[in-house]
Curated annotation (Swiss-Prot):
Coiled coil: none annotated. A divalent metal cation binds at E92, H128, H153. The lineage of its organism: Bacteria, Pseudomonadati, Pseudomonadota, Gammaproteobacteria, Enterobacterales. GO terms for molecular function: 3'-5'-RNA exonuclease activity; magnesium ion binding; single-stranded DNA 3'-5' DNA exonuclease activity. 3'-5' exonuclease that prefers single-stranded DNA and RNA. May play a role in the H(2)O(2)-induced DNA damage repair. CDD domains: TatD_DNAse. This is 3'-5' ssDNA/RNA exonuclease TatD.
Length: 259
């Protein structure tokens, strides 16, 4: 199994990153993608990936929350990071109209700029969309023929939104959100609709600790070593064998990111 979304640059991991990676290996996680969400964190993510070249890779991008920070200097930084074989995708980029930490037009501008950069560099894109589906698809769609591949990370949308994303050829990233009986019920019902060769799994650690985990870690911090729990839950919802699902989703990740 492969974790496509780990926020390993988070200060929550500052004291024990090596142990976090060790626990993930021991849990059977075969690799992980470290997410970059702004220029600085993208540099930090690549630095961490280089310390574990057989196990960790990174993305480089500007999350919609940080879209107001986008500049020519940011683009130059991401282009430089892309020279490393450990940096395998542009993102996390997209739109988030849930909280609008950057205004929608700033978000759209930064999203377009990163799609252009991904097309220029022939890299996949690692996408974010929350409460912005129609605008998200309208911006993304013209770029798709020019992009190597695209994954919508941490999908939490509706059935029509899922069908729209699949129709456009997107890969779908699923997190422990499906383990939340309060928020994840609709998402749980959508699991059988995702083609096996388009499904990717992720923890989004340290966020989104699976709500149904027992026992819960005292820290309430999510970790990549909990990915097997998500695998089990997704397999159950799809009627799949957990081992086969773990292998298939890991293969999907390695193909998508050319690992």
């Amino acid at each position: 199994m492969f974790d496509i979304g780990v926020n390993l640059t988070s200060t929550q991991f500052a004291k024990d990153r090596d142990k976090v990676i060790k626990r993930a290996r021991e849990a059977g996680v075969s690799g992980m993608l470290i997410t970059g969400t702004n220029a600085l964190e993208s540099q930090q993510a690549l630095s961490l990936a280089r310390q574990h070249p057989d196990y960790c890779w990174s993305t480089a991008g500007v999350h919609p929350h940080h879209a107001s920070e986008w500049s020519g200097e940011t683009a130059a930084t991401l282009r430089r990071l892309a020279e490393s074989p450990q940096m395998v995708a542009i993102g996390e980029c997209g739109l988030d109209f849930n909280r609008n930490f950057s205004d929608p037009e700033q978000q759209a501008y930064a999203f377009n700029a990163q799609l252009a950069l991904a097309a220029e560099l022939s890299l996949p894109v690692f996408l974010h969309c929350r409460e912005a589906h129609e605008r998200f698809i309208s911006i993304l769609k013209p770029w798709l023929p020019k992009l190597k591949a695209a994954v919508l990370h941490c999908f939490t949308g509706t059935r029509p939104e899922l069908e729209s994303c699949l129709a456009e050829g997107l890969f779908i990233g699923i997190t422990g959100w499906i383990c939340d009986e309060r928020r994840g019920q609709e998402l749980r019902e959508l699991m059988p609709l995702i083609p096996a060769d388009r499904l990717l799994l992720e923890t989004d650690a340290p966020w989104l600790l699976p709500r149904d985990m027992r026992p819960r870690p005292p820290s309430r911090r999510n970790e990549p070593c909990f990915l097997p729990h998500i695998v089990q839950q997704v397999a159950l919802l799809r009627g799949d064998d957990a081992g086969e699902l773990a292998a298939q989703t890991a293969l999907n990740a390695r193909r998508l990111f050319n690992l």
